[in-house]
């Protein structure tokens, strides 16, 4: 169990293709739609998006969430398998996954939000987080505001995607992906520091 002591904002939705194009000028996504989540972006691509967004805004507040922040926000106070409890039968109300996606992404915020008003925390696209992946990191990590290992070869993605089955579109599973990988089920959402 970990705790988050520093307040932060997390975007209600995954970054859309329209938002990506406004900053980057082109759309790398396989499944086109202005309000669909941008996908087919690497962790490195996302860092460049964040750099440009912060420069445009004249700030340094936008970033990826840490893995701990992401799970805290996904769960929204729940201790269940999913943000809404343990009933897999309810997943289609909250998530685009392999049983209902038609093998593609969908516009953000078309499924029910979690208790804190965050959409698509399960499914649609997996989401990059800031942390390096460490298989045993959480067995000895700080219990308050863990930030992942100091280095590594892979980054963490969370949340599952449109092509995952219900057993992988959960609140807790962690997946490791090299930071240069692009995939049509992989996107992100922004966090914003408050200080």
Model region roles, listed by residue range:
Residues 39, 68-71, 87-88, 158-161:
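Short, solvent-exposed turn/loop segments enriched in Gly/Ser/Thr/Pro and often Arg
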Residues 1-78, 99-119, 194-195:
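Short aromatic-cysteine micro-motif
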Residues 30-33, 82-84, 140-141:
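Short, hydrophobic secondary-structure boundary micro-motifs
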Residues 23-26, 76, 85, 97, ...:
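Residue-level signal for well-ordered alpha-helical positions
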Residues 79-105:
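Chymotrypsin/trypsin-fold serine protease catalytic domain
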Residues 13, 41, 85, 97, ...:
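Structured loops at beta-to-helix junctions and adjacent beta-edge loops in soluble globular domains
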Residues 1-3, 78-79, 101-104, 121-195:
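Surface-exposed recognition segments
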């Amino acid at each position: 169990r970990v705790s988050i002591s520093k307040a932060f904002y997390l975007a209600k939705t995954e970054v859309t293709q329209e938002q990506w194009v406004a900053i980057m000028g082109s759309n790398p996504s396989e499944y086109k739609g202005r309000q669909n989540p941008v996908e087919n972006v690497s962790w490195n691509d996302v860092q460049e998006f964040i750099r440009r967004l912060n420069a445009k805004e004249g700030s340094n507040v936008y970033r990826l969430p840490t893995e701990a922040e992401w799970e805290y926000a996904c769960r929204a106070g729940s201790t269940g398998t999913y943000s809404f409890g343990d009933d897999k039968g309810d997943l289609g109300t909250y998530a685009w996954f392999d049983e209902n996606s038609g093998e593609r992404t969908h516009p953000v915020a078309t499924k029910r939000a979690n208790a804190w008003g965050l959409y698509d925390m399960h499914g649609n696209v997996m989401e990059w987080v800031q942390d390096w992946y460490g298989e045993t990191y959480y067995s000895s990590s700080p219990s308050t505001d863990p930030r992942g290992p100091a280095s590594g070869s892979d980054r963490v993605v969370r949340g599952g995607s449109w092509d995952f089955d219900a057993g992988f579109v959960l609140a807790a599973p962690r997946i490791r992906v090299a930071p240069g990988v692009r995939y049509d089920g992989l996107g992100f959402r922004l966090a914003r520091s408050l200080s």
